[in-house]
Amino acid sequence: MPYLDQVLREVLRLYPPVPVNTRTAHKTTILPTGGGKDGTKPFMVREGENVAFCVYAMHRREDLYGPDAGQFRPERWDEDLLLFQNERTATWGYLPFNGGPRACLGQDFGFVEAAYTVVRILQKYPIVKPDMYKGDIQGRKWLGWSSHQPEGIEMVTEERQKMTIVLSLGDGCRVTLGR
């Protein structure tokens, strides 16, 4: 199961459920970094101002995830990632479920539920590519307020007439039985 854990982490890294997030400052504060030309100077945020952060872009930072940060490579979670070299990036460099006191309360449940679903599908059905795909299956990238693929990638069991499984980040997993 360690590899499944790595696969799920990598999927959530590349396609976070909420790719862009915003917060409103309730009081004037100074952030320790984000100012100046190189982003290393303090930055003042006034009361009432909105601060947006892009998890989608952060999860593709080469300084945290290596030179292949834009590629799907689950094995990266088994390595000594740059992400874990200091406490701040280890805590705030991977945010598919947000972080701090506003982190998703259901993240552990969601992770276990996703792992269970993937395992049960793989145990029960041999998955093959549909005839329409000749090479690698490439999904269409989509970025909005919620990460989803408008067109699901269709995967079919060997006995196509009995079952079709459509995987789509936007709609969850739909299973259609029958012909």
State where each predicted segment sits.
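Active-site-adjacent bridging/hinge elements
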Residues: 83-96
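C-terminal domain-closing interface element
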Residues: 9-16, 150-179
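Cytochrome P450 heme-binding "Cys pocket" and the immediately downstream C-terminal segment
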Residues: 90, 107-161
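Conserved cytochrome P450 K-helix E-x-x-R motif and the immediately C-terminal K′/meander segment
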Residues: 1-39
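Active/binding-pocket-proximal capping segment
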Residues: 25-29, 67-77, 131-138
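Conserved hydrophobic/aromatic pocket- or pore-lining residues that grip, position, or stack substrates
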Residues: 11, 48, 72
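C-terminal, well-structured subdomains that either form a transmembrane helix-short loop-helix hairpin
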Residues: 41-58, 93-118
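Conserved cytochrome P450 K-helix/beta-meander segment immediately N-terminal to the heme-binding cysteine loop
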Residues: 53-84
